[in-house]
Amino acid sequence: MVHPYLFLQFFRKLLEPLHISEAGADAIAYTWLIIALLLILSMLATKGLKTVPGGLQNFMEVIIGGVENMVVETMGHHGKPFFPLIATLAIFILVSNLIGLVPGFFPPTANINTTAACAVIVFVTTHVVGIKEHGFKYIKHFLGPILWLAPMMFFIEVIGHFSRVISLTLRLFGNMNGHELVLMIFFGLAPFLVPLPMMLMGVLVSFIQAFVFMLLAMIYIQGSLEEGH
């Protein structure tokens, strides 16, 4: 699903030699745009830091502080090392969701490749952290408490862990792509005031989906840090 007109059209020409689909090229182009915007915003917010923050610095400190508090409350103080990853994913997903509300812009999270990439990052981090924390004993997370049921539980747990990737991918993709479809239908029927309620709803959906993804990422990583039974 793409908007009737798009920003950064020249990226399509740039990506043509890679034989990427139109939707994929749009997602890549807008992902680069969001990364550039976040980098510029970070540099502006950290330029000339003051003890008493104001303006952009204060705004960014509120956001970062809120995410950090949520990480500590959910994962405990041993979850602080994962704060940069969680915050990066949350802010990237939120901005990606919100940018689709600007006419002519495409949200990267409405492309399944973007959401799958974010989900795979969480999946890999979860198991790398688990192996690093527990070593070979990490396999206990997959065996269950009853020894004679261990083979069956291992199979079930492996499927369950892979289903997390599918769940994270499809939940975010489905909500954002569905919202894009509905918004485009409303714009096609009545391009002025009628789509406004859906755009306001889109703001709420954008925040909720970013929060849900962040919360599940913290829960999965926290689970890998716990002792297996």
Swiss-Prot record:
Main localization, broad class: membrane
- Source organism, top-level taxon: Bacteria
Name of the protein this chain belongs to: ATP synthase subunit a
* Keywords carried by this UniProt record: ATP synthesis, Cell inner membrane, Cell membrane, CF(0), Hydrogen ion transport, Ion transport, Membrane, Transmembrane, Transmembrane helix, Transport
- Membership in a protein family: Belongs to the ATPase A chain family.
Write out the GO MF terms.
proton-transporting ATP synthase activity, rotational mechanism
Q: Where does this polypeptide localize?
A: Cell inner membrane
InterPro entries in UniProt? ATP_syn_F0_a_bact/chloroplast, ATP_synth_F0_asu, ATP_synth_F0_asu_AS, F0_ATP_A_sf
Q: Name one GO biological process term.
A: proton motive force-driven plasma membrane ATP synthesis
PANTHER family in UniProt: ATP SYNTHASE SUBUNIT A, CHLOROPLASTIC
- Summarize subunit and interaction data from the UniProt record for this chain: F-type ATPases have 2 components, CF(1) - the catalytic core - and CF(0) - the membrane proton channel. CF(1) has five subunits: alpha(3), beta(3), gamma(1), delta(1), epsilon(1). CF(0) has three main subunits: a(1), b(2) and c(9-12). The alpha and beta chains form an alternating ring which encloses part of the gamma chain. CF(1) is attached to CF(0) by a central stalk formed by the gamma and epsilon chains, while a peripheral stalk is formed by the delta and b chains.
Q: How does it sit in the membrane?
A: Multi-pass membrane protein
Record's function text: Key component of the proton channel; it plays a direct role in the translocation of protons across the membrane.
Record-linked Pfam families: ATP-synt_A
Report the transmembrane regions from the record: 25-45, 82-102, 104-124, 142-162, 181-201, 202-222
Q: What GO CC terms are in its UniProt record?
A: plasma membrane; proton-transporting ATP synthase complex
